[in-house]
A protein has these predicted regions:
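Conserved N-terminal beta1-alpha1 strand-loop-helix module at the mouth
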Residues: 1-86, 144
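Conserved anion-binding
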Residues: 76-77, 84-146
Length: 146
């Protein structure tokens, strides 16, 4: 049973703000695994604001560490995720001007698209979750998507 998951996005945010190579998200992932984390969460944003492609690939290759990769519904992001093969994918809404994720996916508008995306991950044995609003209707729609 998983007991501790750690989001390490802001390790990369600090690195990128400094314009340097440290702190390194890979080292952070290795460290939190060593001290007992069961899972690492990273968000590979379209604008690569924090975690970048190289970070994601390296972190997903750590043996014995489960990785939850947050991505948007952008086709390029879906392809990247299928290529690096995290254990889990969480599909999140993304707005370039937001500081952090501001709300859930628009499930009614994107139901068909989400179903196709979920099936792509399912076919590769990648478990998928959705970042949703806490409403009964979104819970019902999520369940219908599998």
């Amino acid at each position: 049973m998983r007991r501790l998951g750690v989001n390490i996005d802001h390790i990369a945010t600090v690195r990128n703000a400094r314009g340097e190579i440290h702190p390194d998200p890979l080292n952070a992932a290795i460290f939190v695994k060593k001290v007992g984390a069961d899972l690492i969460t990273i968000h590979l944003r379209e604008d690569r604001r924090h975690i970048n492609d190289i970070d994601a690939k390296k972190i997903c290759s750590i043996k014995g560490l489960l990785v939850n990769l947050e991505i948007s519904t952008n086709e390029n992001m879906i392809k990247k995720a299928l290529k690096i093969k995290p254990n889990f994918v969480c599909i999140v809404p993304e707005n370039r001007k937001e500081i952090t994720t501001e709300g859930g996916l628009d499930l009614k508008k994107n139901k068909s698209k989400l179903k196709k995306i979920i099936n792509k991950f399912k076919n590769k044995n990648i478990r998928t979750s959705l970042f949703i609003n806490p409403t009964i209707s979104d819970i019902i729609i999520s369940k219908s998507l599998n």
